[in-house]
Curated annotation (Swiss-Prot):
This is Malate dehydrogenase. The keyword Isomerase does not apply. It comes from the Bacteria. Belongs to the LDH/MDH superfamily. MDH type 1 family. One of its GO terms (biological process) is tricarboxylic acid cycle. It catalyses: (S)-malate + NAD(+) = oxaloacetate + NADH + H(+). InterPro entries: L-lactate/malate_DH, Lactate/malate_DH_C, Lactate/malate_DH_N, Lactate_DH/Glyco_Ohase_4_C, Malate_DH_AS, Malate_DH_type1, NAD(P)-bd_dom_sf. Its EC number is 1.1.1.37. The gene is mdh.
Amino acid sequence: IGQALALLLKNQLPSGSELSLYDIAPVTPGVAVDLSHIPTAVKIKGFSGEDVTPALEGADVVLISAGVARKPGMDRSDLFNVNAGIVKNLVQQIAKTCPKACVGIITNPVNTTVAIAAEVLKKAGVYDKNKLFGVTTLDIIRSNTFVAELKGKLPTEVEVPVIGGHSGVTILPLLSQIPGVSFTEQEAAELTKRIQNAGTEVVEAKAGGGSATLSMGQAAARFGLSLVRALQGEKDVVECAYVEGDGQYARFFSQPLLLGKNGVEERKSIGTLSAFEQHSLDA
């Protein structure tokens, strides 16, 4: 995900932004040199090795995509043992180096890595629930694509709110809330299932060659850029993400968020659900 995400950010971040790449792999500074030849006004540096500190200094937004990817036959929870440790270590460094940064966790299983990050930040005394996000944007862009295909719309005209979590049946697209589009109950059930299983569709199609890295890079870039716009004072920036809420549905829950200068400005209502959606939420 990292390289695709870095390429998109190098091209799309506002002029004057600084982009830092970090990975344990020694290739990372070279990836930054490669990207630095792209003519945009975004400064880029790459860091590798055991110490992430220089990459984090002064950061306003940190996106964590480090970890192992899914292989066929695995679900997102199979990644837990390895990826939990990676996220824990990185977040400990964030707590020390840039405790006020907004942190977006991409590393699966998001439903648990976000909770781990929250505990690490709490232990360090720097947790702000308005600044920690599980990036679920891939579920939204997939929903937009699949709905547009099914209904003959332009994908750019469709925006589907997706609530719940970021794995399997916890992913709940609110298909009933798309203006000007309606679904039969069967269509809604089939489409919901396809959105929930879209990650597996990619894992199987890649036949052992990894998971969704390019579409995830696009999703993470969209979320990161929305955060940057909101931090810079743009109004009415809304994205769905997996955050600690008021505990109405679960401690952590993906819902529409109004973003602002301090991260989450407002956790927006999930609105009125169809009977099918309500049943899925209650389950």
